[in-house]
UniProtKB/Swiss-Prot annotation:
Protein name: Bilirubin-inducible fluorescent protein UnaG
Assembly behavior: Monomer.
Keyword Cytoplasm annotated: yes
Tissue: Detected in small-diameter muscle fibers from the white muscle layer from juvenile animals (glass eels) (at protein level). Detected in small-diameter muscle fibers from juvenile animals (glass eels).
Keywords, in A-Z order: Cytoplasm, Luminescence, Photoprotein
Comment, domains: Forms a beta-barrel structure that accommodates bilirubin in its interior.
Length: 139
């Protein structure tokens, strides 16, 4: 089921991402340019339930990140937004990848799903919701 997420994805649209970054406590220099970032996502799968999500933002920057995980298993994460003590878990729920991060008594959720051939990521922190959509890159 996760196979449909595998591949290279380029940003197509971003809504409210800067506000989302503010809500999670990202530094001002990150949140101010949130919707202007143009990331490419590389999603790969190995041995069924092991995945890697790599995010590049054009020329190499401190915002670039890579996360390796096994579905359903909690892992320590070191996000590029500089939050500390983040524990994350990613689960396949129906046809969606649901990614939950917890730190300092807070929680945020990323839901990745395929809609009309696009990868749509809905990020939620409290009552702040951001939506970013990606188109599959042509090789």
């Amino acid at each position: 089921m996760v196979e449909k997420f595998v591949g290279t994805w380029k940003i197509a649209d971003s809504h409210n991402f800067g506000e989302y970054l503010k809500a999670i406590g990202a530094p001002k220099e990150l949140s101010d340019g949130g919707d202007a970032t143009t990331p490419t996502l590389y999603i790969s799968q190995k041995d069924g339930d092991k995945m890697t999500v790599k995010i590049e933002n054009g020329p190499p920057t401190f915002l670039d990140t890579q996360v390796k995980f096994k579905l359903g298993e909690e892992f320590d994460e070191f996000p590029s937004d500089r939050r500390k003590g983040v524990k994350s878990v990613v689960n396949l729920v129906g046809e969606k990848l649901v990614y939950v991060q917890k730190w300092d008594g807070k929680e945020t959720t990323y839901v990745r799903e395929i809609k009309d051939g696009k990868l749509v990521v809905t990020l939620t922190m409290g009552d702040v919701v951001a939506v970013r959509s990606y188109r599959r890159a042509t090789e």
